[in-house]
């Protein structure tokens, strides 16, 4: 019989622009579920062995891995990823540049 310690757990994010924001929320729910499940298995310090992504998913993976590398824990990683997306959602002020709206409407 193979024990659960013999398995590696991978987290893979896909690409798709704004889908990355959805992935942040999905990751938070998934992380909470796994954290609760792993409390008695000794995995709580290493929720995922492999983290990968493509396109915007690679950005999500980078945010998570850099957080875990700096803080030495997965705890707080979901909040950090959501914080990243909330920061992206704030106004940039680009629409205040004279002529931008007309340019955008023309090319959009």
Question: What annotation goes with each model-predicted range?
Answer:
Residues 4-10, 18-108:
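Patatin-like phospholipase
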Residues 1:
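An N-terminal RHG(E/S)-centered segment typical of histidine phosphatases
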């Amino acid at each position: 019989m193979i024990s659960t310690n013999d398995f590696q757990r991978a987290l893979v994010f896909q690409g798709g622009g704004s889908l990355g924001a959805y992935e942040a929320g999905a990751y938070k729910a998934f992380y909470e579920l796994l954290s609760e499940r792993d409390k008695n298995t000794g995995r709580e310090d290493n929720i995922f062995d492999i983290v990968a992504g493509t396109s915007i998913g690679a950005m999500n993976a980078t945010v998570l891995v850099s957080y875990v590398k700096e803080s030495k824990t997965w705890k707080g990683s979901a909040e950090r990823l959501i914080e990243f997306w909330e920061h992206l959602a704030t106004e940039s002020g680009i629409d205040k540049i004279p002529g931008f709206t007309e340019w955008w409407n023309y090319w959009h």
